[in-house]
């Protein structure tokens, strides 16, 4: 990517197998194999927030009817998603929409670097799947109380929203329905460990996303109202 230099967040990199059980690579190979006989309308790719969504009833209610595939892996950062995309996870399918939700695990990277990583993912999806739209979900606030990572995620969202204005088939969706209370805290009812969503927390996120997906699919079928380049 021009202008990113040696940005580690935009350099495709596999996860280092520090535990020695090969699970990450096994999941990657399974995703590639599972996609060979599928015809999904929507593909989700990202970290644990994507992965755990698949276990909720709302996934079966909203996204299974779209023949959605879930390529979420816990702990993934932008550079790991880039590597997976470069190594076959979109090779055998032609989805209409690719949903990307990743970046909160890029702990050691600046907001600008994380934004560069997300932009690199969008560009790669555009290259590999030019017919597909890309929906980037905004990073959620994290931590029970205000903290630097929460602020960095907010900065990433601002930067990504602005950056995607230059991509006509990319859309940004602020996935936060208001998880931060007026006193600055996040409830464990919404995020059970103040990072991962509970079933209650997933509900408003998934319903807002589902509404956008239906609008985009209808628009591409000539039935919808034209959308701006980024969704509010």
From Swiss-Prot:
Tissue note: Expressed in brain, spleen, lung, liver, kidney and testis. Not expressed in heart and skeletal muscle. Expressed in fetal brain as heterodimer. Not expressed in adult tissues. Expressed exclusively in granule cells.
Record text on activity regulation: Beta subunit (PAFAH1B1) inhibits the acetylhydrolase activity of the alpha1/alpha1 catalytic homodimer.
Main location: cytoplasm
Sequence segments annotated as region (Disordered): 1-20
GO molecular function: 1-alkyl-2-acetylglycerophosphocholine esterase activity; identical protein binding; platelet-activating factor acetyltransferase activity; protein heterodimerization activity; protein homodimerization activity; protein-containing complex binding
Active site: 48, 193, 196
Pfam families referenced in this protein's UniProt entry, alphabetically: Lipase_GDSL_2 (PF13472)
GO BP terms, alphabetized: lipid catabolic process; spermatogenesis
Subcellular compartments: Cytoplasm
InterPro entries according to UniProt: SGNH_hydro, SGNH_hydro_sf
Its EC number(s): 3.1.1.47
SUPFAM superfamilies on file: SGNH hydrolase
Catalytic activity: a 1-O-alkyl-2-acetyl-sn-glycero-3-phosphocholine + H2O = a 1-O-alkyl-sn-glycero-3-phosphocholine + acetate + H(+); 1-O-hexadecyl-2-acetyl-sn-glycero-3-phosphocholine + H2O = 1-O-hexadecyl-sn-glycero-3-phosphocholine + acetate + H(+); 1-O-hexadecyl-2-acetyl-sn-glycero-3-phosphate + H2O = 1-O-hexadecyl-sn-glycero-3-phosphate + acetate + H(+)
A GO cellular component entry from the record: 1-alkyl-2-acetylglycerophosphocholine esterase complex
Phosphoserine sites (modified residues): 2
Keyword Lipid metabolism: yes
Residues where N-acetylserine is found: 2
Keywords: Acetylation, Cytoplasm, Hydrolase, Lipid degradation, Lipid metabolism, Phosphoprotein
Coiled-coil region list: none
Function: Alpha1 catalytic subunit of the cytosolic type I platelet-activating factor (PAF) acetylhydrolase (PAF-AH (I)) heterotetrameric enzyme that catalyzes the hydrolyze of the acetyl group at the sn-2 position of PAF and its analogs and modulates the action of PAF. The activity and substrate specificity of PAF-AH (I) are affected by its subunit composition.
Family named by the database record: Belongs to the 'GDSL' lipolytic enzyme family. Platelet-activating factor acetylhydrolase IB beta/gamma subunits subfamily.
Note: Originally the subunits of the type I platelet-activating factor (PAF) acetylhydrolase was named alpha (PAFAH1B1), beta (PAFAH1B2) and gamma (PAFAH1B3). Now these subunits have been renamed beta (PAFAH1B1), alpha2 (PAFAH1B2) and alpha1 (PAFAH1B3) respectively.
Subunit record text: Forms a catalytic dimer which is either homodimer (alpha1/alpha1 homodimer) or heterodimer with PAFAH1B2 (alpha1/alpha2 heterodimer). Component of the cytosolic (PAF-AH (I)) heterotetrameric enzyme, which is composed of PAFAH1B1 (beta), PAFAH1B2 (alpha2) and PAFAH1B3 (alpha1) subunits. The catalytic activity of the enzyme resides in the alpha1 (PAFAH1B3) and alpha2 (PAFAH1B2) subunits, whereas the beta subunit (PAFAH1B1) has regulatory activity. Trimer formation is not essential for the catalytic activity. Interacts with VLDLR; this interaction may modulate the Reelin pathway.
Protein name in the entry: Platelet-activating factor acetylhydrolase IB subunit alpha1
